[in-house]
Amino acid sequence: MNIELGLNKKVRRAYGIDEIALVPGNRTLDYDLTDPSWMIGNLKREVPIVASAMDSVVDVNTAAELTKLGALGVINMEGIQTRYENPDEILNQIASVGKNDFVPLMQKIYSEPVKGELILKRINEVKERGGIAAFSGTPQAAIKFQEILNNSKLDLFFLQGTVVSTEHIGMEGKESLNIKDLCKSMRVPVVAGNCVTYEVAKLLMRAGVA
């Protein structure tokens, strides 16, 4: 079902897993007649799967492989991939420790700052492997690294947050984020979610979110 947002912009109703119930009916449908494809901006994906932007889920190789399979993998721009030159060594450390040592190790690992040159390197690595470069970052990171992202081969930017609204107000002295301004200034489509109500989702899309 298409929904008109105004300014010639249309969106399609999406459903969560909990909203779907498969009930056998009196007719069946040949799978060749179905079309599960979807689009973000000018990017078309054949499989409606987006892999989570978590260090334990998506790295450069995973993102490239998911692209080849018709899906999409998102890399955490503020994770291990952009803090360390060799993220595999860090992942091996995490896998090797017990429960008692896990928290101190994670605190130590994530105390290392995110490096702009590594963001650029990971984007290039995904593209060199034929993948779609989709990266996720917080509002603060979106502001801090926007110039690097706009001058890279990035394809999609996912705005990361527990709750996302059209305007993020930061602490005094810190630059605040306005999603409408971000969407206008970013070279690539901006994706955002984690909103509960229909009204907020509509506001986000009207602000320019893909």
Q: Which ranges hold each PLM region?
A:
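Active-site entrance/lid segments in N-terminal catalytic domains of soluble metabolic enzymes
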Residues: 1-210
